[in-house]
């Protein structure tokens, strides 16, 4: 018989840096999950992912056990790294703060393809281009 799911939790945690302090500790503690067990498993799985924030979907079962799925870093983090900036523009229509090439956009789209709700690579590229524009980043050839 399958275990009964009592909750699902979505978090963004820096790769390889999960620890019992907020926001991880309180979120897991109030659901009765073994915090250190999760932190060790998450850090082991994400130790090679750089310094990105990693989205994680944690499924908690009635016996307080859990499973989790790690996803790729957010598109905005990948765009910021490609453009070499710290944050997006406060006024993206007037202030362009960086440039990325179409090749970089295609690479980001290929990386995120499984997490995006796009049916084709072209659709994924358009999603990434839209995110870049809303951050004040120009796309050049």
Swiss-Prot record:
Any one GO BP annotation for this protein: translation
Keyword check for DNA-binding, yes or no: no
| Record PTM text | One or more lysine residues are methylated.
Q: Which GO terms describe its cellular component?
A: cytosolic large ribosomal subunit
Which is one GO molecular function term here? large ribosomal subunit rRNA binding
- Is NADP included in the keywords of this UniProt record? no
Q: Which UniProt keywords apply?
A: Methylation, Ribonucleoprotein, Ribosomal protein, RNA-binding, rRNA-binding
Task: Kindly give the NCBIfam families that the UniProt entry links to this protein.
Answer: L11_bact
What family does the entry list? Belongs to the universal ribosomal protein uL11 family.
What this protein is reported to do is described as: Forms part of the ribosomal stalk which helps the ribosome interact with GTP-bound translation factors.
Q: How does it assemble?
A: Part of the ribosomal stalk of the 50S ribosomal subunit. Interacts with L10 and the large rRNA to form the base of the stalk. L10 forms an elongated spine to which L12 dimers bind in a sequential fashion forming a multimeric L10(L12)X complex.
Q: What is this protein called?
A: Large ribosomal subunit protein uL11
């Amino acid at each position: 018989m399958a275990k009964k799911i009592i909750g699902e939790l979505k978090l963004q945690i820096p790769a390889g840096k999960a620890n019992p302090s907020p926001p991880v500790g309180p979120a897991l503690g109030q659901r009765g999950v073994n915090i250190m067990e999760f932190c060790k498993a998450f850090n082991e799985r994400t130790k090679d992912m750089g310094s990105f924030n990693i989205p994680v979907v944690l499924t908690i079962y009635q016996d307080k056990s859990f499973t989790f799925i790690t996803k790729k870093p957010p598109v905005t983090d990948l765009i910021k790294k490609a453009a070499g900036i710290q944050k997006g523009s406060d006024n993206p229509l007037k202030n362009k703060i960086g440039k990325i090439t179409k090749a970089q956009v295609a690479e980001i789209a290929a990386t995120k393809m499984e997490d995006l709700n796009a049916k084709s690579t072209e659709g994924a590229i358009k999603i990434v281009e839209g995110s870049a524009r809303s951050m004040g980043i120009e796309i050049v050839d």
